[in-house]
């Protein structure tokens, strides 16, 4: 059922957005923004667009990356499992787009922790959905393997990157964890 947002809710949302322009990492404001979005039934697409705008303004905005991952987790969790498994399904395609977006962030500033932690979150989501049967094991292995190949290329371009070795090792362990998952 649709309900028209109140003027107070619209004002709160506008205030949150103004405050986040001033202090992009203010997680208290981000939490309040999410609460208001939930109350107003703001679509996931609109929320993802908002987080993308904040990331474009500041790729080091850890809060924007974090809330983007929360939204993706929510989207996939609420999506019908069959549509996720469907070849070329929009949710699976969205996961690939997110991984590409993240890779761009890593190439832009490989010593910034925000994109690395977002990558970790995305890989953990892939593992979670493979283990729960929402995502086919082969698809999960392919997604993670592609990321490891991209990280190997990044390693050649930026051998002194401080986070690369640790995250690459962790992602390799996660890949092995789902390779051993019984289908």
Predicted regions span which residues?
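Structured C-terminal portions of repeat-based eukaryotic scaffold domains
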Residues: 74-183
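Eukaryote-skewed repeat-based solenoidal scaffolds used as protein-protein interaction platforms
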Residues: 1-109
């Amino acid at each position: 059922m649709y309900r028209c947002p109140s003027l107070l809710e619209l004002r709160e949302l506008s205030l949150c957005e103004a405050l986040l322009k001033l202090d992009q990492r203010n997680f208290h404001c981000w939490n309040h923004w999410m609460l208001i979005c939930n109350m107003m039934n703001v679509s996931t697409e609109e929320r993802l667009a908002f987080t993308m705008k904040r990331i474009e303004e500041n790729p080091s905005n850890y809060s924007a990356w974090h809330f983007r991952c929360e939204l993706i987790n929510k989207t996939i969790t609420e999506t019908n499992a069959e549509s996720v498994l469907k070849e070329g399904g929009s949710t699976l395609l969205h996961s690939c787009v997110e991984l590409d977006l993240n890779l761009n962030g890593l190439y832009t500033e490989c010593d910034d922790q925000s994109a690395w932690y977002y990558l970790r979150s995305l890989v953990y989501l892939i593992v979670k959905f493979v283990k729960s049967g929402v995502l086919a094991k082969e698809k999960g292995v392919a997604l993670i393997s592609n990321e490891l190949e991209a990280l190997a290329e990044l390693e050649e371009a930026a051998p002194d990157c401080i986070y690369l070795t640790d995250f690459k090792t962790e992602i390799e362990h996660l890949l092995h964890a789902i390779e051993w998952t019984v289908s």
